[in-house]
Structures are given as structure tokens and as C-alpha cells.
Swiss-Prot record:
Record text on cofactor binding: Binds 1 potassium ion per subunit.
Stored HAMAP family: GTPase_MnmE
Key word Ion transport present: no
Single GO molecular function: metal ion binding
Keyword Membrane: no
Family: Belongs to the TRAFAC class TrmE-Era-EngA-EngB-Septin-like GTPase superfamily. TrmE GTPase family.
Species: Phenylobacterium zucineum (strain HLK1)
Protein known as: tRNA modification GTPase MnmE
Keywords, sorted A to Z: Cytoplasm, GTP-binding, Hydrolase, Magnesium, Metal-binding, Nucleotide-binding, Potassium, tRNA processing
Single GO BP term: tRNA methylation
Ligand binding (GTP): 223-228, 242-248, 267-270
Binding positions (Mg(2+)): S227, T248
Length: 445
């Protein structure tokens, strides 16, 4: 790469320290020009920085990383200056005056990828680590950055290479001493690989949920207490609460953390038949969000004296809560028994005003989240991109297994399966895909 890039690696604004990174062939010249000399590699050295006109910029810590032993694999440096915006601005202006270019988002990590310092799956781990908000996200991102998916992919790729060698030998050298039972010898290997890849693809949904959030829907009739419960769980007034049925017209998503995992809790419009066009759209959205949720909490108004109308959508994995048990009217206990009898799942009586009830509910929800996201080993695949490529690879392997009598077709299917796996780590990938992935990074990374 012929040009040299720079960018602030810390967030803009007033702070104790700001870091500006530089990478590329002219890094050494830039450091000498601003700092007066080249510090000892990989040691923080105090230097006074001056621009090209001799004006002092700041007293800074300067770190020099000669390539290829740097993050990007090329000559790189960091300037740690005082965090005032004027100081950072003066340093950025000085670097631009030396002919260096402001980096695009993710360009430092892209250079690391293109110089073989990490593969594409590991680069995605860097992005996930920067974006992590919970312990679950942080741990998963570290696994990705550490090469968990890359190592699994490499093992699969090696096995495919051996199988492909058998098929290609049978095709290219039909008259030589090549085993006649090539397909029979390759079948167990391909079946094992297909099963492992399919399992990883299925488990990728768990990794996606860790990244994006476990989705919990609060569902029920109007005035069942959904908004009140959401506010109690969130610890703030996230939704409007009134005595008027149908107040909630749209899905209100509130992020929170349970057991170290990100959770998206959604208050939804009350489910009922209505002639109101706006409310009807809210009901449609409520049903759609609930259908895609990982867990549904069905709320039944315990203060009502009428037998609850239980929706047919209530399923075995759902939870049912009989709300407003603190009110003197109603039949909360009777409705709990009725729910258990009619739909076969236990129903708990709760009140959003009871600290003990809310503590119990949070603990119960945390257990469900951990059961869904935290069981066993962490998922190798964590993104939709991974899942789609794994599905493509397994499909090709299943085709290859079915081509017992057509070695040429089997070889091509194995080759395409290997190609799909290679795209996970970026060994081959269209430029547009790489650009889209690295564009999600922050500037300076």
C-alpha cells in the first residue's frame, strides 16, 4: 500500500489523553519530523511534538512499531497527547500537512487483514469487541478474535482438501493406480463434515442473539399491565401507562442486561379485534414481534372478574403472568389455576409494585436467558454471514454425497463447499463484501 494513513483512535471531546494512530510507508518520516527522532521500537518515549513550521503541538508519548511487527503489519506509530480538542486538531493538521491521509472507517484493521495479521472472522471479532456492551458479548468477541471459528474452519478445510484430492485423482488419472472405491472412502468423511457444519450453522443463531440481544416480548390483552411491568423491569418510565385500554400503539423495545447478556424487552400493543386502523396496525406489529421473540411473557389481568380469554398462540416454552395481584378485586389465584389447566403451563401471580416479585421475575428470566445462550461451549459462528456460508457448504457436501456414481460432480461440489468455507475467513471474497464489513468499524480501528 503506497499511502500512509492516520486517524484518532479515541473518541472526540475533552479527555485526559487522546491517541492518534499512523500506519504506512511514510510513518517513520512523520515520526522523525514531528518528534525530532525515531524512538526505540515498542517503548513509550516522551517527546515534544512540533509541526512543519516549528510550532509546538504538545508534549506526548510516542510509540514506534516497525513493520511487520505491528497491528497492521506495516510501519506504524501512536501519538498519545493531552485530550483537548485543540491539541488533537493541531496534531491531525500537522499529519495532513505531511501528505498523510485520514483513514477510512476500519482501514487499520483492513490493512491488518490484507497483510495476514488476522483473518476476516478475527477482524469481525475486533469489531464485536469494540461494540460489546455486556460480559456475554465481550467473552464471545474474545473467542472470535482468538481464532475459534478460524481454527474450526481450518480443520474442516483440511479434511475437504484430502477428500478433494481423492476425487480429483480419480478424475485426472483414471488409468493409474487410484482406488476404485473413491466415493465409498470419501463418504464417511463428507457425512461427518456435513453434520458438524450443519450443527455449527444451527448454533450460529445463539451467537447472533448474544451479539444482538435475546428478545423477550410482553404480550396480552389491553390493560393487562404490560407497560407497567416493562417500566418496573427497566427501572425507568420507558412506556406510557394510563387506565385507557389501547394506549400502546407500537412496539417499544428497551435494552437491558440479564445474567451478563444483552436483552431486548418489548412492550407491545394489547391484542384484540379493533376497527381502529392505527390500533389494528399496532396489533399486527405486536403479533409479528412476538412470533420472532426468543421468549414470550403472556400477561393476564388478575384484577378482572371475567374469565380470561387466552390466545391460542400461547406455547409450551412461554411464561404466563397473572398481574395486579396486589389489588383487592379480581381473581388472580383462580386465573392462575385456570391458565395452568387450560394451556398446561404454570402461571405466576405478580405485581409490578412488589420488589420481591420483580426480583423473582428477573431471576427467572435470567435463568431462561442463560439456558438459551450460555449452555455448553461458545458458538463458533456468530453472524448471519457465517450461518449462510455454513449452510451453503453443508448443502454442497450433501450433493457430493449423493453423487456416488459421478466422481466429477462430487469433486465440483466438494470444491464449492471448500470455497464457501474459505469465504468465512476471507481467503476469497468479493471486494464489495470486504468493504461492507470493514465500513462498520470506527475510524481509527
Amino acid at each position: 500500500m503506497s499511502d500512509t494513513i492516520f486517524a484518532p483512535a479515541t473518541a472526540p471531546g475533552r479527555a485526559a489523553v487522546a491517541v492518534v494512530r499512523v500506519s504506512g510507508p511514510r510513518t517513520q518520516t512523520a515520526v522523525r519530523t514531528l518528534a525530532g527522532d525515531l524512538p526505540e521500537p515498542r517503548r513509550a518515549s516522551v517527546r515534544r511534538l512540533f509541526d512543519a513550521d516549528g510550532g509546538e503541538i504538545d508534549q506526548a508519548l510516542v510509540l514506534w512499531f516497525p513493520g511487520p511487527g505491528s497491528y497492521t503489519g506495516e510501519d506504524a506509530a501512536e501519538f498519545h497527547v493531552h485530550g483537548g480538542t485543540a491539541v488533537t486538531g493541531a496534531l491531525v493538521e500537522a499529519l495532513a500537512g505531511l501528505g498523510l491521509r485520514l483513514a477510512e472507517p476500519g482501514e487499520f484493521t483492513r490493512r491488518a487483514f490484507e497483510n495476514g495479521k488476522l483473518d476476516l472472522a478475527q477482524a469481525e471479532g475486533v469489531a464485536d469487541l469494540i461494540d460489546s456492551e455486556t460480559e456475554g458479548q465481550r467473552r464471545q468477541a474474545l473467542e472470535q478474535l482468538g481464532g475459534r471459528l478460524s481454527q474450526v474452519q481450518a480443520r474442516w478445510r483440511e479434511a475437504l482438501t484430502e477428500a478433494l484430492a481423492l476425487f480429483e485423482a480419480a478424475v485426472d488419472f483414471p488409468d493409474e493406480e487410484v482406488p476404485a472405491d473413491v466415493a465409498a472412502r470419501a463418504r464417511p468423511v463428507l457425512e461427518t463434515l456435513a453434520a458438524e457444519i450443519e450443527a455449527a450453522a444451527a448454533d450460529a443463531a445463539r451467537g447472533e442473539r448474544v451479539r444482538e440481544g435475546f428478545r423477550i416480548a410482553l404480550v396480552g390483552a389491553p390493560n393487562a399491565g404490560k407497560s407497567t411491568l416493562l417500566n418496573a423491569l427497566a427501572g425507568r418510565e420507558a412506556a406510557i401507562v394510563t387506565a385507557t385500554p389501547g394506549t400502546t400503539r407500537d412496539v417499544i423495545e428497551v435494552p437491558m442486561v440479564l445474567a451478563g447478556y444483552k436483552v431486548l424487552m418489548a412492550d407491545t400493543a394489547g391484542l384484540r379485534d379493533t376497527a381502529d386502523e392505527i390500533e389494528a396496525e399496532g396489533v399486527r406489529r405486536a403479533r409479528a414481534w412476538a412470533e420472532g421473540a426468543d421468549l414470550r411473557l403472556w400477561l393476564v389481568d388478575g384484577s378482572s372478574e371475567e374469565t380470561p380469554d387466552l390466545p391460542a398462540e400461547i406455547g409450551e416454552g412461554d411464561l404466563c403472568l397473572i398481574t395486579k395481584r396486589d389489588l383487592p378485586v379480581g381473581n388472580a389465584g383462580a386465573w392462575a389455576a385456570e391458565v395452568a389447566r387450560r394451556i398446561g403451563i404454570p402461571a405466576a401471580e405478580v405485581t409490578a409494585r412488589g420488589p420481591g416479585d420483580m426480583a423473582w421475575l428477573k431471576e427467572t428470566l435470567s435463568e431462561r436467558v442463560v439456558e438459551s445462550l450460555g449452555g455448553g461451549e461458545p458458538p463458533a459462528a456468530t453472524r448471519l454471514r457465517h450461518r449462510e456460508l455454513l449452510a451453503e457448504a453443508s448443502e454442497r457436501l450433501r450433493h457430493a454425497i449423493g453423487h456416488d456414481e459421478h466422481v466429477e460432480l462430487a469433486a465440483e461440489d466438494v470444491r464449492l463447499a471448500a470455497r464457501a468455507l474459505d469465504r468465512i475467513t476471507g481467503r476469497i471474497d468479493p471486494e464489495a463484501v470486504l468493504g461492507r464489513i470493514f465500513a462498520t468499524f470506527c475510524i481509527g480501528k
